[in-house]
């Protein structure tokens, strides 16, 4: 439980198993290579508050992080926004990432290969009225399976090569 440690965020939950193997941390050049990492059987809740202490940090974040293999199994994360304005939840059966590169100085983030299996995602704006059909304020996606290559987020734009995508939404929409 991080209550009181981060000015506008509380993170609590439990970690079943966490493993990180790294053979390359270069403090002088601000680079990290994570060879293998995994998170299993974990539950995390993130609560964002509407008031935060002013950030007085003067140094820039220059880190470049390379991730060879990252795996998440049987884990979930729930995020609640200030004033209960939005709720986001993800229950991951398995998520695997291969060859990720994250340049924090340039705000450039890439993943060569991502696979998601047997997962669920929920997006909810609790104060909005429910609508018939596909309701963008109350989404619940189940049976989510996806394979994506060449994911890139840079300059507020995202691109990806979607190899496969399967999902069901509670309104009856199915993508196969």
Task: Annotate each PLM feature.
Residues 1-176:
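N-terminal targeting/secretion presequences
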């Amino acid at each position: 439980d991080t209550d009181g440690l981060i000015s506008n965020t509380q993170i609590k939950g439990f970690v079943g198993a966490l493993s990180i193997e790294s053979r390359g941390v270069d403090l002088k050049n601000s680079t990290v290579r994570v060879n293998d990492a995994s998170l299993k059987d974990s539950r995390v809740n993130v609560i964002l508050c509407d008031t935060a202490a002013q950030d007085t940090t003067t140094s820039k974040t220059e880190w470049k992080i390379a991730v060879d293999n990252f795996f998440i199994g049987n884990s979930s994360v729930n995020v609640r926004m200030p004033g209960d304005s939005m709720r986001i939840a993800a229950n991951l059966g398995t998520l695997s990432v291969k060859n990720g590169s994250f340049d924090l100085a340039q705000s450039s983030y890439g993943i060569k290969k991502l696979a998601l299996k047997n997962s669920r995602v929920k997006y909810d704006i609790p104060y909005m009225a429910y609508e018939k059909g596909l309701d963008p304020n109350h989404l619940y996606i189940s049976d989510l399976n996806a394979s994506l290559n060449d994911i890139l987020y840079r300059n507020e734009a995202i691109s990806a090569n979607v190899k496969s995508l399967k999902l069901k939404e509670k309104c009856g929409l199915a993508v196969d």
